[in-house]
Swiss-Prot record:
The lineage of its organism: Bacteria, Pseudomonadati, Pseudomonadota, Alphaproteobacteria, Hyphomicrobiales. GO terms for molecular function: fructose 1,6-bisphosphate 1-phosphatase activity. This is Fructose-1,6-bisphosphatase class 1. It comes from Methylobacterium sp. (strain 4-46). The gene is fbp. The keyword Repeat does not apply. Belongs to the FBPase class 1 family.
Length: 326
């Protein structure tokens, strides 16, 4: 399909036969995302946080009820919501990611994952996903998605239709961009400190080039940036209590991002040597460290964790310094 093609036309042509339930669910998610984009654009973000979350979630749930979705896993729910008893698809959904950004007129997003409903779909590793993607609500509402035929980006047009704006998206293998929440530096493990410190040293450090750092408190927005510009987005495990495995939900967030990244030639790991799509799932609310983006940059982070790049003692960029101590 050529640029400008409607999402529904692409689905009708490429997702046929026994895969029609996938097409129906993706079309419903796109419809709900289009409505969410209009809601946020027209002032819906001014509603109270709880009201906005409820409105967006209700929009997606209503759309999925009309599709062959058997189970719907939502971020705060202890158990999946049963929708259609004989449905073929199980969906994991984060309806509104990065809601806090909206108060400052910054982008937010939605993440989704489709799995076969047979058996125990949310007890299986992410590699069983049949489709996944994320939506970003910013100057444009864009849908990044894969259903097994590479990664594509569709842009919402004024009529309310998603149209193909980028096909066969390919993440550059290397980049000088990295994203990490530096406010949590004191909780990072030593290899992560070493990686960031070497990036901060730029051309004078061991990596021999200057880097740019950015951070946006939305996984969907970070994934969109990595998809379009490359680089590495890092949500590490931390030393503080309860954060050894990070804060990213494996089923709702890490798995769909990983499927899209790999479809575009990128990578997604736990920061060490474990591919996100291979991680065993033990719990619906399971968390994982997450590193994704350009394949070579993701691998570089792993080298610091396995000792191939981490050299132990470092200069005190992240030391205990301040006005009252050296």
């Amino acid at each position: 399909m050529g640029l400008g093609s409607r999402l529904d036309a692409c689905l009708a042509r490429e997702v046929a036969g026994g895969d029609r339930p996938i097409a129906a669910v993706l079309a419903a998610l796109a419809e709900a995302a289009a409505g969410t984009g209009r809601l946020l654009r027209d002032g819906g973000a001014d509603a109270g946080p709880d009201d906005l979350d409820a409105a967006v979630q209700a929009r997606f749930v209503a759309a999925l009820r009309e599709t062959p979705t058997a189970l719907l896993a939502l971020p705060e729910a202890e158990a999946p919501l049963a929708l259609m008893p004989d449905g073929a698809i199980a969906v994991a959904l984060t309806p509104l990611d990065g809601r806090e950004n909206l108060a400052g007129n910054q982008p937010a997003g939605t993440l989704f994952s489709l799995r076969p409903a047979a058996g125990a779909p949310f007890r299986e590793p992410g590699r069983i996903q049949v489709a996944a993607g994320f939506v970003t609500y910013g100057p444009r509402t864009e849908l990044a998605v894969t259903w097994g035929a590479g990664a594509r980006i569709f842009t919402l047009d004024p009529s309310g239709a998603f149209r193909l704006s980028r096909e066969a998206v390919a993440i550059p293998p290397t980049s000088t961009l990295y994203a990490i929440d530096a406010a949590n530096a004191r909780f990072w493990e030593a290899p992560m400190r070493a990686f960031v410190e070497d990036c901060l040293r730029g051309s004078e450090g061991p990596r021999g080039q200057d880097f740019a750092m950015g951070w946006c408190a939305s996984l969907a927005v970070g994934a969109q940036r990595a998809l379009c510009r490359g680089g590495v987005h890092i949500l590490p495990g931390e030393t503080r209590r309860g954060r050894a495995n990070g804060a990213t939900r494996l089923i709702h967030e890490a798995a769909p991002i990983a499927l899209v990244m790999e479809a575009a030639g990128g990578a997604a790991t736990d920061g060490r040597d474990a591919r996100i799509l291979d991680l065993p799932t033990l719990d619906l609310q399971q968390r994982t460290p997450l590193v994704f983006g350009s394949a070579e940059e993701v691998a570089c982070v792993g080298k610091y964790h396995d000792g191939r790049r981490h050299t132990g003692a470092r200069s005190p960029l992240f030391g205990q310094r301040g006005l009252l101590r050296a």
